[in-house]
């Protein structure tokens, strides 16, 4: 195998299933590399998708957002428990009660794209997901985002200036439009070698099946 496996992950920072999917992908990639010793390391790219693009740039009340989203039935508490249980099984201690602000995720996706240019995208994505789901940090707080960026090697003042600008706003919009035009309407959504897709946070074995298929398939295929 001369070419590395390419993995594109369409995701949003406020989607708990995306964090679960990230952990399952990591486990699948570890198994993949064990099964292909000496092969090139898979290349993972995170692509933006905003589940709630109409939320104001400063975010909105989490409680209000949940109430609006779940009318008239109200929040599905059983589903929330299921997500929390699955997350704990993967070592993710979600603290959803700490989330008071439902953010607009444009700035977080901008930071993700900026980090990609420096080869640190996965670390940035992990830092932002952890901050939101485990600490309740607002992803619209530029000071908090700048602090988080320093944990993966960025300069605080440069990140703060970047977030205050409009740099990469149109890049995020273009990338999101491209995946929506391609038919992506939910996240997480995995694309292996540009042709084999998996929609949803499936088990590791499903992701591995897609990886194997992606190295041999000549046409597009859907797995899971």
Tell where the protein language model's regions lie, with residue ranges.
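C-terminal cap of thioredoxin/glutaredoxin-like
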Residues: 3-14, 20-34, 38, 42, ...
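Structural alpha/beta surface segment adjacent to cysteine/selenocysteine redox centers
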Residues: 23-132, 221-222
């Amino acid at each position: 195998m001369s070419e590395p496996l390419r993995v594109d992950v369409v995701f949003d920072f406020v989607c708990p299933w995306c964090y679960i999917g990230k952990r399952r992908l990591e486990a699948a990639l570890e198994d993949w590399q064990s099964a292909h010793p000496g092969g090139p390391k898979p290349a993972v790219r995170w692509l933006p998708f905003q589940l709630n693009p109409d939320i104001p740039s400063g975010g909105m009340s989490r409680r209000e957002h949940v109430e609006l989203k779940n009318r008239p039935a109200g929040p599905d508490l059983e589903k929330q428990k299921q997500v929390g249980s699955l997350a704990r099984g993967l070592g993710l201690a979600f603290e959803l009660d700490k989330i008071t602000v439902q953010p607009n995720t444009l700035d977080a996706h901008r930071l993700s794209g900026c980090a990609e240019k420096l080869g640190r995208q996965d670390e940035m994505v992990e830092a932002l997901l952890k901050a939101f789901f485990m600490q309740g940090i607002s992803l619209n707080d530029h000071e908090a985002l700048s602090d988080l960026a320093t944990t993966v090697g960025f300069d605080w003042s440069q990140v703060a200036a970047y977030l205050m600008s409009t740099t990469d706003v149109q890049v995020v919009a273009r990338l999101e439009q491209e995946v929506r035009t391609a038919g992506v309407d939910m996240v997480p959504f995995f694309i292996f070698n540009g042709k084999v897709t998996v929609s949803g946070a499936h088990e590791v074995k499903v992701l591995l099946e897609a990886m194997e298929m992606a190295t041999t398939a000549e046409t597009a295929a859907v797995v899971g």
